[in-house]
Amino acid sequence: MKEMKVIIAGPRGRMGHEAVLLMERTEHFNLVAAVDYKHGGEKISDLPGMPALDAPIYADLHTCLEEVEADVLLDLTTPEVGKQHVTLAVERGLRSVIGTTGFTEEELKQLTETAKEKAVGTIIAPNFAIGAVLMMKFSQMAAKYFQDVEVIELHHDQKLDAPSGTAVKTVELIRQNRESKQQGHPNEVEQLEGARGANVDGIHIHSVRLPGLIAHQEVMFGGDGQMLTVRHDSFNRASFMSGVKLSIETVMNLDHLVYGLENIID
């Protein structure tokens, strides 16, 4: 397979660290640079626990793109920074794989239009775990037969956004196979605000944030005399790397924006 030159934004995070290790062990990936505002001017090998890679670190993406030739930007930063990075990448014609969440419908619409206009491949993935993507697809299938459903997503207590992008994407897929319906008793009253979680077209999403968790979600379907639970658990960040690898390889052949790994797996 042809060599792919990759820039990683956010190498110091747990996901970023796993991604650097992925670069090291994948023959056709070449980490040509990283972006980290705290370590501009250093090399990847200067960071604690990193492999001996000489890729330079830049304090900002704009400077990095001025000096480095790359095929793909892999962004694993925060939601706000990720939005800035993908916008810049698309405008510059650089393919990007974005692992941050929190995009609004309007932001996705604008990015989709710009990516199409520029003919630049872009993948935004709420979840890189292949198992999580299958969990979403199975939930979409089940929604055709079970109209009553609620979603519980559980993550580590350092996650900044709630509900998770995976939960939101799951509900979007379920809605495609489910008529609009308010879940629960029509006259129910919350004695404490938020007790029933977020409400998306009648589907409730409950967010849990605790130390010790990584990324987990269960989708609970209820029916007469039965219940179906579809659950996925990520126990470490290595679970996301197969999806990261697939995304980088796939985005090279795209000329538009794709939202969600379920749209690129067979």
From Swiss-Prot:
* Catalytic EC class: oxidoreductase
The UniProt record lists the EC number as 1.17.1.8
Q: Which GO terms describe its biological process?
A: diaminopimelate biosynthetic process; lysine biosynthetic process via diaminopimelate
Q: Name one GO cellular component term.
A: cytosol
Q: Does the keyword Phosphoprotein apply?
A: no
Pathway(s) per entry:
Amino-acid biosynthesis; L-lysine biosynthesis via DAP pathway; (S)-tetrahydrodipicolinate from L-aspartate: step 4/4
Tell me, what is one Gene Ontology molecular-function annotation carried by this entry? oxidoreductase activity, acting on CH or CH2 groups, NAD or NADP as acceptor
UniProt keyword Cell wall biogenesis/degradation, yes or no = no
Q: Give the NCBIfam families listed for this entry.
A: dapB (TIGR00036)
Name the chain's protein: 4-hydroxy-tetrahydrodipicolinate reductase
Task: Give the organism, scientific name.
Answer: Bacillus thuringiensis (strain Al Hakam)
**What does the organism's lineage look like at the top?**
Bacteria, Bacillati, Bacillota, Bacilli, Bacillales
